[in-house]
Amino acid sequence: LDCYKFDTLERDIRELGTMTGKEDEAERYCLFLNKWKDLVSSRLSNITGSLPTAYVEGYSAYSAQGKDSGVDILMGIAKGKNLAADLGEQWPKVTPEWVISENPAVILKTASLKPEKTLDQVREEILTRTGFETLNAVKEKRVYVLNGDLIYGPRSPAGLVYLAKALHPEECSGISPE
């Protein structure tokens, strides 16, 4: 059991509930998870064709979230194209030039909550990177910073909603993961 990635979370939670004698609590959580997954899926059901592109950066600068990472799994449900998925690694290192050449529609940075730096400060650091002023995501004000704890594990339904709202703000308006 890892209770880590969204695509295996429901199974892992049910198994954990069985192991601990907490089947009812596990089932309540699975209903909660599926409620949010189904809501996002229904809001995005009419989206076809090309998907919005996203560069998703992990905790370190230019450490992308690639193929089969937690974000990549959520991206499939949220109908976005993870630009780093084609690089063949889960967490590939990329360069500023690569990000600029890919010109993502959305930038999402996962960050940890630390008292010395706010999420707004992390966002400002991204906005002021050399050359990033040319990116569509920056020009269109579609740069987001998200607590990384919302991408993996039991909190990931909230991360799914945030990601879907970042990729498809019109279709997901009115949905709040709070």
Summary of predicted features, one role per range:
Residues 1-19, 85, 92-134:
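Acidic/His-rich segments in extracytoplasmic proteins that coordinate ligands and/or metal ions
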Residues 57, 72-77, 92-93, 117-128, ...:
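Conserved N-terminal glycine/acidic-rich loop preference
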Residues 64-91:
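Alpha-helical, coiled-coil/dimerization segments enriched in small aliphatic residues
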Residues 135, 139-141:
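A short helix->loop->beta-strand "cap" motif at the edges of active sites that frequently abuts
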Residues 1-63, 84-86, 141-178:
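Extracytoplasmic substrate-binding proteins
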Residues 14, 72-73, 97, 161:
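Active-site phosphate/pyrophosphate- and oxyanion-stabilizing loops and adjacent acidic/basic residues
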Residues 66-68, 118-121, 156:
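Short, well-ordered secondary-structure micro-motifs
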Residues 45-48, 64, 74-76, 97-102:
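Short, conserved, surface-exposed binding loops centered on an aromatic residue
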